[in-house]
């Protein structure tokens, strides 16, 4: 077939060259955005008298037909037409005649594709924000059910201090809240229109960029046409924000995997989110959590891939920029899928409160309580720290825990120890006393839950 840009050329490309250069296999995902962008563009052209109202109406009727066909998956795309833009233009001309060729007046594929991607990411980021909020709502529900569920808190994957399970869960709530904030902030840069920037230098036609931007729901326009067609910061920012979100999901999944093991038994995954072994009938594998952890690397790769593509590109458009889309599409699909799985997995998991409780009575995570006890009685904390270290050594040598040590032995270590020490050693009491702002104390958790509910109330309503 003859190319819409073929006037300059005397030879046709080989089929394999066409296939190598074509992007329609993946950029057809932008079909709705491409048609909607064209609707706004031709409306603006008519307003400015660049095309007649009659021509604009004919073009819009043709575009509306193609949009309907697209939504019903009836459009047949061709590699020969290269990309989504030329495919749609070719179909439009076939549908309404040569007047369809006037649609591209005052526009280039360079500003057209950038517009499509801005529209696409605006929609997808808003969807990801909503999905993240739904996950946060599940975290709030699990936290509410586990305010007084005591578990070991860890540093270096060693038991450190007793904490509330709700406190641990809410740590991820606030990580996700930062992710939401980053996505929301990025919308300020996504919601800007490059349409009308032309190939790189603007256009000689008297277009109204602000009007077409308004029609598409953008908050403004790019101030520089070179920047408009060559900028992919908005995609990189999306990939970066998504990498951080996936990192948070991956960290949580790592803990869920550990907690569901026989060595911990803190939680049990629902059968819906686990699989078995083809050879070992006893196995219940946390495959969905492992997949989320694994897919995090995939999202990181998409970010670094585009950063590498962009690092040496001169202004303005270069064909290298065709490589901006597949990683973006893949990241959207991956993040949406992981959020959906994570939400269901956390909503259906069973918390083994008894196992968690046993874990904090069979360790030394209450050692800091003794150091604080002595410090409250006037002993310098460093001296208290040394005494408790010796107590832990004594216990490990005897094969006992701090609650098992007699008061007589405690007094041999320091005359400051009294009977009330054993109240301090209770994991429940240890958690309750940590009432500093943001701490694991029950009152602090209740305060945190109120704030968290306020941030997710719109999701709960819907």
Curated annotation (Swiss-Prot):
Record-linked NCBIfam families: argH
Organism of origin: Bacillus cereus (strain ATCC 14579 / DSM 31 / CCUG 7414 / JCM 2152 / NBRC 15305 / NCIMB 9373 / NCTC 2599 / NRRL B-3711)
Gene Ontology terms: biological process: arginine biosynthetic process via ornithine; L-arginine biosynthetic process
The protein's annotated pathway: Amino-acid biosynthesis; L-arginine biosynthesis; L-arginine from L-ornithine and carbamoyl phosphate: step 3/3
Name assigned to this protein: Argininosuccinate lyase
Catalytically driven reaction(s): 2-(N(omega)-L-arginino)succinate = fumarate + L-arginine
Main location: cytoplasm
Keyword Amino-acid biosynthesis: yes
Subcellular location: Cytoplasm
């Amino acid at each position: 077939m003859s190319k819409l840009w073929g006037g300059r050329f005397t030879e046709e490309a080989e089929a394999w060259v066409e296939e190598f250069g074509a992007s329609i296999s993946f950029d057809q995902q932008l079909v709705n955005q491409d048609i909607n962008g064209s609707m706004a563009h031709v409306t603006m052209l008519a307003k400015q008298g660049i095309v007649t109202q009659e021509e604009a109406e004919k073009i819009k009727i043709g575009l509306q037909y193609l949009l309907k066909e697209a939504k019903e998956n009836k459009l047949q795309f061709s590699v020969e037409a290269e990309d989504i833009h030329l495919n749609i233009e070719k179909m439009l001309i076939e549908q309404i005649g040569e007047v369809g060729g006037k649609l591209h007046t005052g526009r280039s594929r360079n500003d057209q594709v950038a517009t499509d991607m801005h529209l696409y990411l605006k929609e997808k980021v808003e969807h990801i924000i909503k999905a993240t909020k739904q996950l946060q709502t599940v975290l709030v529900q699990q936290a509410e059910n586990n305010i007084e569920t005591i578990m070991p808190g860890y540093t270096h994957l060693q038991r450190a201090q007793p904490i509330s399970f709700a406190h641990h869960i809410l740590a991820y709530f606030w990580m996700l809240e930062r992710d939401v904030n980053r996505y929301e902030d990025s919308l300020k840069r996504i919601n800007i229109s490059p349409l009308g920037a032309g190939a790189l230098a603007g256009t000689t036609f008297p277009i109204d960029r602000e009007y077409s931007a308004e029609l598409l729901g953008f908050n403004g326009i790019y101030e520089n046409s070179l920047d408009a067609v060559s900028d992919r910061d908005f995609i990189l920012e999306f990939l970066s924000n998504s990498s951080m979100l996936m990192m948070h999901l991956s960290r949580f999944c790592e803990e869920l995997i550990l907690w569901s093991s026989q060595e911990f038994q803190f939680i049990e995954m629902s059968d819906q989110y686990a699989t078995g072994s083809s050879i070992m009938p006893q196995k219940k594998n946390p495959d969905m959590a492992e997949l989320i952890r694994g897919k995090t690397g995939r999202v990181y790769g998409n970010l670094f891939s585009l950063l590498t593509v962009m690092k040496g590109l001169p202004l303005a458009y270069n064909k290298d920029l065709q490589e901006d889309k597949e990683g973006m599409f893949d990241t959207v699909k991956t993040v949406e899928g992981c959020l959906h799985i994570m939400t269901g997995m956390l909503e259906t998991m069973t918390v083994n409160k008894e196992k968690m409780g046993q874990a904090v009575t069979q360790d030394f995570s209450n050692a800091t309580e003794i150091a604080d006890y002595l410090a409250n009685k006037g002993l310098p904390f460093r001296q208290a720290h040394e005494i408790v270290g010796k107590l832990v050594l004594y216990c490990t040598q005897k094969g006992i825990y701090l609650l098992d040590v007699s008061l007589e032995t405690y007094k041999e270590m320091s005359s400051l120890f009294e009977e009330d020490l054993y109240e301090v050693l209770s994991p429940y009491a240890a958690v309750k006393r940590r009432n500093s702002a943001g701490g694991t104390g029950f009152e602090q958790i209740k305060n945190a839950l109120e704030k968290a509910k306020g941030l997710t109330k719109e999701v709960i309503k819907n």
